[in-house]
Amino acid sequence: MTLVAGTTVRPGVPGEARGLPWRLDTDGIAWLALGHQGESVVTLTLERMEALADTLREIGADTRVRALVVRGPGPAMFCAGADIKLVQGVASAAEGEAAAVAGRTTFARLRELAVPVVAAIEGPCLGGGLELALFCDFRLASDAASTRIGLPEVKLGILPGFGGTVNLVRLAGLPRALDVVLQGKVLRPLQALKAGIVDRVVPAERLEPLARSTALALVQAGRKSPARRLPLAARLLAMAPARWLLARSIRNKLRRGPARLYPAPRRALEVCLLAAHAPLQRAFAEETRALGELVVTPESKGLVQVYFLTEASRRLGKQPGTDVARAMVVGGGVMGAGIAGLFASHGIRTRLCDLDTAALVRARRTLQADVDGRVRKKSLDRAAAREVMDRLAVSTEWGSLRETQLWLEAVVEDVHVKQRLMTAAVERGLPRDAVLATNTSSLSVDEVSEGIPCPERVVGIHFFNPPAKMPLVEVVRGKRTSDAAVHAACRLAVRLGKYPVVVRDAPGFLVNRCLAPYLNEAATLLLEGNEPSFLDRTLLDFGMPMGPCRLLDEIGFDVAAKVSEVLCAAHPGRMVASPLFAAMVEARALGRKSGGGILGADGKGAGPGMDVVRRLRAAIPGGRPQATRTEVLRRLVHPLVDEACRCLDEGVAASEQDVDLAMVTGIGFPPFHGGLFGYARREGLQRIVASLDELARDVHPRFSPSDALRRRAVPASGR
């Protein structure tokens, strides 16, 4: 492409120049980069927004410009959205509204240009980045693996407020816009095409020439944008009765369960409904008001805090080390198969080994079903699906280990079996720099590594079930585990799309250690005569994704009993297992895996385990009155805070931030609180201490708060 003397600003850090880099080619097409060469991430800071406004004024005043192409500063990066620190810093609704107006006004300059504007999207195009693209006249998306397109703002407790909510309704229609905005969806390119967000998906290597030819075609056609026709469903919703029916249905859904605790989806729904029929400026004004209202809510502040926790965790993936290219997983059960499939789905050539041929066949079928589902949803194309399946080999034999960089066992929770397998891996030629990982959930990593020729290479990589869906990975450091092994585990977790939290080797690690008293107390409340539906509903209304009775059924009473046994042995006297666990195991009412536990196999109604519950209730003398909702929350949630404080004092977790992330991503603690300690500080640590003291007096001494919690409850001025 030949360039003529256009306007260019000197390269540098955003804010050093009054504009962004742009150039003009001989066909009169201006090429505007949203950042400077070498920038790996483009966020919309105040300085960048000012630079964009200045540059668009400059381009608009240049009579040589016939069309404009907007793109990122390099491959694999368009724009990741607004700087979240700006969202965090908004102190009033008026300040939020002013920021929304300023952002939308800047982006609107793209639409106001007299020439066609094409967005050439490759890499992340999220939040404010997509809002910018929606003001362009045509959107091309690269099919590169890095391309992600979406409006995730509701996950921060707000809505797209730079015009994105309104523009998406006008572009794609109400049903599609609601699907994206209310769920904060992030889409792959083909999904974005199907949703009507982008106009065309093109091969990555052809993005620039096709952006150029598209711009020229619009110039030659003498129009800014192509003619578009909304889908029939969207056109029908232009009629008030149809909109009313849709709105009623969605409002009812948003009033139920944890969704009712989040104001952003409800407010976004109202803005979308208005945008479907109201004049454009009125809809923009309502979007602005909504952003101002939402950005200062406690829910938004809590969700933003969790966002920063996840970003800190992802930075652990940048620690020094080599990315794993080849792995072996030993153990073809549910966890081993799930982990192997996860590895294969993220570019790692994986051999899954088990003596049970049927287990290996099931593992292949499970991964194939998952891949086929992703193809149907257009999150994966058929060629990529074949590559995933090709990366997973299954065998009853280990074969050569010479190229294996990560060896992971997910076999039965028997320390001697794990030790024998690890020793065999070393003796069979596992490379000296390879990592030996255990997925144990109840055994000590130090004990597993005992007698292994190279214990410094042994690290716990504790996935939660199901591995493909659960976002947390506990990286467990034993006394002899090297930094290199920990770094490798963290890099792997981030590559798999997970959030690693490094914990010290201790019984139950962090999540199970904190969760055990919660589940044990739920079992105690159940045996006291409280109904499962009441207990579950109380915690659902608090914001948990599922109640404790259903969670016990999902985990399985056999697993709960094993974890409880380990923790009770480690903390004798303080932790005592509920008799319900052993009784359910004896009755084979293990939960969903056995056809039902407390609840039925479908998670509803009474399961076979309720006969066990009633028998145990009858054997308990006296009893307590039916608990109130407040008492249930105090007895379940406040001990969580106390146990977390104990973990911090013992060095199981390094910081409150690590605990917060682990509780949100590991047990589903309501993220709008900003994590467990976010909740505790909002509730008041002194109030929690007083609550536990009262429970210790009136219910049982087990509630007595720890010194670790009492110290944290003392105001800083009094320490």
Predicted segments with their positions:
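Amphipathic alpha-helical repeat scaffolds
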Residues: V41-T45, E122, N439
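A structural alpha-helix within SAM-dependent methyltransferase catalytic domains
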Residues: A53-G60, R111, A344, V426, ...
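Conserved CoA-thioester-binding segment of acyl-CoA-metabolizing enzymes
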Residues: M1-R71, A108
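Glycine-rich beta-to-alpha active-site loop
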Residues: R104, R109-L156, P160, V334, ...
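Terminal peptide-recognition signature
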Residues: L32, A51-L52, V70, D83, ...
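Glycine- (often His-adjacent) and acidic-residue-rich active-site loop
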Residues: G72-T106, C125, K155-I158
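N-terminal glycine-rich phosphate-binding loop for ADP-containing cofactors
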Residues: R10-P11, G15-A17, R23-D25, G35-Q37, ...
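Short, well-ordered coil/turn segments that N-cap beta-strands
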Residues: R64-R66, V115, A434
